[in-house]
Amino acid sequence: MDRIIAAVVAGVIALAPMAATAQDYGRYSDAAAQTELSRIADVRMAVMVPMRDGVGLATNVYRPKNAPGPLPTVFVRTPYNELANNARTTRTALTWISRGYAFVIQNERGRYFSGGDYQILGYPQTDGYDALTWIAAQPWSNGKVGTLGCSSSAEWQLALAAQNHPAHAAMVPQASGAGIGKVGRFQEQGNWYTGGVPRSLFFVWLYGVDNPLRAQIPVDIDQETRARLVRYNDLDAKKPEVNWPSQIRHLPVDQMLSDLGEPPATFEQLIARTPADPAWRQGGLYHDDMG
């Protein structure tokens, strides 16, 4: 971990581009922010970035117009619906573009317009690495990528940093609470177990996030059509409201979501694992044996 922290400090210095006058884009209306983004940025929406197994991940790329040369990049990966006309994404892109960075945001595998099947944290040991390789190879990139994000968008950065990708110049993992390892005599599994007891609050989150019945866009669709689909369509699941104070007491626990009509998905995989199951170390969570 000391190596990771040192890389953050050194990378932030190395990544820094030209200075720019700061703007408070939080004061802009949604319409004004979108207008300003159109004025100062070249935008490509839903670019399908290929992973090593051929699966494409939907990615928005924002670059300053008329940039004088290759740019450093700020990169966010997210499981949430932040690519399609998202006001927060627009303001974040403005913040970085106005300072001379490219800004790239990508949906994790199996989320919204990305291909493949969802796994919590989205295969950071392969997908995260491959995404950085793709960014660094673009003609507009100077080969330096800083990763940024909170919660899930922070946790994948730790597993990525342990791989020492040559383009990974800086990282800012905010509120990265999940990891795998031993705390005293207990095995910890990120958000799932604490001292061997499953965290029922995480079940509620998973019900809202996991969507195994999501629509998938044909992989051979052209880029322009895919971008229009992202702009004008919403793949968020519209699930029924649940009385969680009652449902959280459901027994047996492993049928808590199937009792709501949910098809088998991530919950059923994780609830079947014991705290010491070696499968915890095969996913994207940072663990004791990394780096």
Ranges and model annotations:
Residues 19-22:
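Boundary at the C-terminal end of the N-terminal hydrophobic targeting segment
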Residues 64-136, 186:
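Cap/lid segment of the alpha/beta-hydrolase catalytic domain
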Residues 151-152, 175:
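Catalytic nucleophile serine of serine hydrolases
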Residues 139-151:
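Alpha/beta-hydrolase fold nucleophile elbow
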Residues 90, 98, 162-164, 170-290:
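Accessory cap/linker subdomain of secreted extracellular hydrolases
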Residues 28-69:
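N-terminal cap/lid segment of alpha/beta-hydrolase-fold proteins
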Residues 154-165:
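Short glycine-enriched nucleophile-adjacent loop
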Residues 7-16:
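Bacterial N-terminal signal peptides
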